Amino acid sequence: MTEMNSEFPSTPTFARLPIRLQRDAMARKGLVVDLHLILRQGVRILFGLRRNTGFSDGMYHLPVGHLEDEETISAGAIREAKEELGIDIHPADLQLVHVMHQRSGRLSLFFEVRKWSGDLVNAEPDKCESLDWIPADRLPDNIVPYAAVALQFIRDSENVGTYGWD
């Protein structure tokens, strides 16, 4: 019997594919899968100010990490929340709101989260200078560019987008 990914029954088709097919599709394309968390508190979104990572240091970015081998997308997002923010998220509280295919060989998944348990902490202070709640309608200029584009897609209710192909 094929294992089904039933954790997101109302999300885009990819999330409903059997897990084996998800992995096969990503491996064939050689894509790195990034898992982004859009934690919302009212009109504010949680961002981390990056440092000492070698990628976009000094810029704000959503909490993000990579999907690991033999891990479902929801399990990866939940793991990243615990590792980076010290919080627990129930799978039912993850909402896949956007999928972005980047020309750089990345498939970026964006999960909106409005409910979690535990106190938010900067669990990776060596990579993150601070955690800041920023109003969604007043984002600063120093946000990682593809994340800013993804947030615009989400505001425009576009659940699939690309970056770097133009």
Task: State what each model feature region is.
Residues 41-83:
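Conserved Nudix-box catalytic region and its N-terminal flanking loop in Nudix hydrolases
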Residues 2-3, 125-166:
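Nudix hydrolase/Nudix homology domain
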Residues 25-31, 53, 98-110:
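Acidic pyrophosphate-coordinating catalytic loop
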Residues 30-34, 40, 57, 62, ...:
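Short connector loops at helix/strand junctions that flank enzyme active sites
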Residues 88-98:
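A short coil-to-beta-strand element that immediately follows conserved catalytic motifs
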Residues 2-36:
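Acidic, metal-coordinating catalytic segment for phosphate/diphosphate chemistry
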Residues 44-46, 95, 108:
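General beta-strand recognition
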Residues 41, 99-121, 132, 136, ...:
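Active-site-adjacent beta-strand/loop module that shapes the phosphate/pyrophosphate-binding cleft
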